[in-house]
């Protein structure tokens, strides 16, 4: 019976709970441990019994001693439903008095029935005892024949309860009962019972919980009223005097009754049970009682008191215990309405109980109805707490039960309501993993994978997808997309353009360009009144220099001196890109040269105006007209010919024409209207960089806009640092540098590359972010060619590269620009057969780490305008590493070119001598085959190379003519028309008709172009 069915009834059970009961129930906690490692804490409830005095009027259940002596138990008082304050039994005084009146009426009715029943019982007792003994003996004989068990003393058969009479009387001595051996019974088949409610309408059955535990099983046996009618007299217990009253009966001794040896197997059935109507007469069904599995659930209602269990009949009073007195309708109503002291219903209606027990299958355990919710099974009992394995296995935790209830509620509601998706702005970088995308979208990764699978893309949770695919997924899930890139860190590095109202005039930046040895540096020295050219190695400029000249009128002009050698093409290009005006220096006696043409191309590419300075006009033979005509071939039209290019004749040595040159520069700057904003953060370009032993990384920069100050945080390429010092070209300390000012800055953590842009950033975090991104980008670019080459053409190119000879080199230069120029020149020397492979290049002195790196690669160390430290020199001597020093780039490139030329394979050149034809082949013992030949063309020479041709097929290539004889004499040469004998080294397959071609091979050494 479910909790819902009982809630509306007056005597219905209340829902079970694991909470400790109040009042008469004490609770404790017991911790269970299982073999599989789980532990469980259960609540143990112990009901405290309460004893009541007989004279108080509280008609509680009689004690076990009274029940043993055959007294009819009085109806149990029904406590009030409200549970308010009452007597000790839970009833108010008015209810107790009403209850007492009902009980007194019942006693009077029972007294009247005693006299009528006594005579009938006496007559039927003898016959019934005889029939019972005969049936018991027959059943015992049959069971003993099947499986003889040990014989034990049978318990006394129960007798019907004796009627209680009001007058007191002495208790009657118990009558001895015959004993018979009892064997395990067969499965009991319940005989059909008759409903006796029609015959005895005034009789009802009242259930009382048993207080006497006679075995270890949890008993739910209840007291039932004694059925009317005859019962076998031999099953009665010793009964007291019929005239004895409740208070006059002898008290029943406390404790369990003395037991004899318990018979093995199942006890005989049929001797227990409540009132079931008139029992059919005859032999009792034989067989053992069916074994039934009783399963209790903590969520299901408990069996009603008096119910034996699911699928089994209710138990009646124990043998020898009198049944309760028949109750009147008032007692029936009071009993039904009275709840159990511990909560819950105390009894069930007899008709429903009997019908349910009668229709239940005897061998079928209680199971869950198909489709019904699976509830928690297991019952909190002493057996479960004590370690009963079956009960412990059936127990489930309270949290599990709660989760099951939640699932049941969700099923009844039609399933959990799916949470509405919230549209978000998803930031998507260039590449992103599926896991990261799911986190940003707040969706499950498996949902994204399913969507991609429907699109035909099979991915795992850690796979990387591009931003286009990620945008498609995010849009499909209803989110908005914001695409970002790692390159976004570069945004704002160089500030926006300035407004005109913030602009001020700035000095012009002039780059001196031209061919080598045309007097560029000498001209700049004349303008600066210095002598820089005298201190240069080889009389040539190998570094880009930056100077600022202050004129007589206070104006300033910034000059950049670029090298004129072919190796410094990148420097010239860099100078053209950062300059405002290009001064093209052309020697009057030499004219336009290759580097002059290159400078013109750089200036045109940078869209920079050109001023032509014809130098060396003091030398005889200088012809400016020749220079003008040669410039016309390269689209340079001077003003004298109607063009816009100024041409100035100067002499750096005689210092003539310098003022005209400065005037032309200022005029061109005025036309350009050069302006910049000094009141902003500085940015510019790195002109040159080097590594100084005492000062560290030194970078020469040109400020384009803003003002660079000491203490600013500067990012230049992949290097950053705080400006510790600002130096001009005269090594003077500066506090700040304005627009178009070249300065040297100290404080960077490394040497930047020439041509890198620099700018001042707001903090160190921003500087680190920029440099880390640039370093990562550079590393990815350097590693990119490793994974290339998936096509067949690339694979063939790799196979050819394996035949390529390489010259490993470690190059250290004084400045980064010089190292860059050397590497560029070496790359131009490379051919399909040889090339120079740069292991390391940089600016600074040669260190021990450079020597060890060169030793591992088997490479020499090239020092350009630098020297090795003492420790590095000693290490190089011990390890056998060659160090070469150079001060002029010509010498360095010539030596490397010679080494690469020596690595080229020499050319094999053949010189034809003559042909001969084999006329006869002789096989001579101990010598081998000898060819008898006739020279048909030219001469044949001993020791020359031969090629044997047979039917237009070469059968011997590059053989050697080992022996040449004329008759019996060995000769060195046989001319045309004569016969001779020939023998070849390592070749015996000579046949008549073969053609022998004789020639010489000469090796020619190759040179790089």
Curated annotation (Swiss-Prot):
GTP binds at residues 514-521, 561-565, 615-618. Residues 111-121, 137-146, 175-189 have a biased composition (Low complexity). It comes from Caulobacter vibrioides (strain ATCC 19089 / CIP 103742 / CB 15) (Caulobacter crescentus). Residues 514-521 are annotated as: G1. Residues 539-543 are annotated as: G2. Residues 505-675 form the tr-type G domain. InterPro entries: EF-G-like_DII, EFTu-like_2, IF2_assoc_dom_bac, IF2_II, IF2_N, P-loop_NTPase, Small_GTP-bd, T_Tr_GTP-bd_dom. Keywords: Cytoplasm, GTP-binding, Initiation factor, Nucleotide-binding, Protein biosynthesis. It is found in: Cytoplasm. This is Translation initiation factor IF-2. Residues 94-110, 122-136, 208-218, 251-287, 346-358, 403-415 have a biased composition (Basic and acidic residues). HAMAP family: IF_2_B (MF_00100_B). It comes from the Bacteria. Residues 561-564 are annotated as: G3. The lineage of its organism: Bacteria, Pseudomonadati, Pseudomonadota, Alphaproteobacteria, Caulobacterales. One of the essential components for the initiation of protein synthesis. Protects formylmethionyl-tRNA from spontaneous hydrolysis and promotes its binding to the 30S ribosomal subunits. Also involved in the hydrolysis of GTP during the formation of the 70S ribosomal complex. Residues 147-174, 311-320 have a biased composition (Pro residues). GO terms for molecular function: GTP binding; GTPase activity; guanosine tetraphosphate binding; translation initiation factor activity. NCBIfam families: IF-2 (TIGR00487), small_GTP (TIGR00231). GO terms for cellular component: cytosol. The keyword Magnesium does not apply. Residues 1-415 are annotated as: Disordered. PANTHER family: TR-TYPE G DOMAIN-CONTAINING PROTEIN (PTHR43381:SF5), TRANSLATION INITIATION FACTOR IF-2-RELATED (PTHR43381). Transmembrane segments: none annotated. Residues 651-653 are annotated as: G5. Belongs to the TRAFAC class translation factor GTPase superfamily. Classic translation factor GTPase family. IF-2 subfamily.
